[in-house]
A protein has these predicted regions:
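Conserved short submotifs of the Hanks-type protein kinase catalytic core
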Residues: 1-6
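AlphaC helix of the protein kinase catalytic domain
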Residues: 7-16
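Activation segment/activation loop of eukaryotic-type protein kinase catalytic domains
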Residues: 53-86
Length: 176
């Protein structure tokens, strides 16, 4: 099967109502849940890797996918794992860490890393840009505090303060 396009081009060329954007986020979240449920981390989520097949959105480009609890060739220190601008904080820490750094950072790339990247993709879907740094309420368009709260949780720079499961994200999106 060939994709008819990617999310980036779709959003650039279509005016999509807010409710449809939430549905799009939910469809992508369910795709990530499917990967998680069979034991995989994607690690390369970005708009260019969300592909449309007929009227269905699917997560593509599985080149950096990793099976949970298995060593992966891309998990060495200083390896750049994932797309620039869409990396989770732990992926960036892994890339930048040095042997003589007395501070130890959580550099495990896992499902919560995918949740962070997915939060960036959702922000892009809703705002038309990628969030940079710590997000603030004033960075987000007026109204829709419910979705902002979900995004802020997903985009927390501390993995310990991020959703531990994509199920939480799906449940919250379903209520909007």
């Amino acid at each position: 099967d060939y994709a008819s396009g990617d999310l980036k081009n779709y959003l650039e060329n279509n005016d999509i109502p807010f409710g449809n954007r939430i549905d799009l986020c939910l469809q992508i979240a369910n795709g990530l849940k499917e990967l998680k449920d069979i034991g995989y981390y994607h690690r390369d989520l970005k708009p260019d890797n969300i592909l449309m097949f007929d009227d269905t959105w699917k997560i593509g480009d599985l080149g950096l996918i990793a099976f949970r609890d298995k060593d992966n060739i891309y998990d060495k220190k200083n390896d750049f794992i994932g797309p620039k601008g869409w990396l989770s904080p732990e992926a960036m820490n892994k890339y930048l860490q040095s042997d003589n750094n007395k501070y130890k950072f959580d550099c495990n790339i896992d499902h919560q890393s995918d949740v962070f990247q997915l939060g960036k993709v959702f922000w892009y879907i809703l705002q038309g840009n990628a969030p940079i740094g710590n997000i603030r309420r004033s960075d987000f368009f007026d109204g829709h505090d419910d979705i902002y709260s979900v995004l802020k949780y997903m985009l927390n720079h501390s993995k310990k303060k991020r959703p531990i499961s994509i199920d939480y994200v799906i449940n919250e999106l379903s209520r909007i």
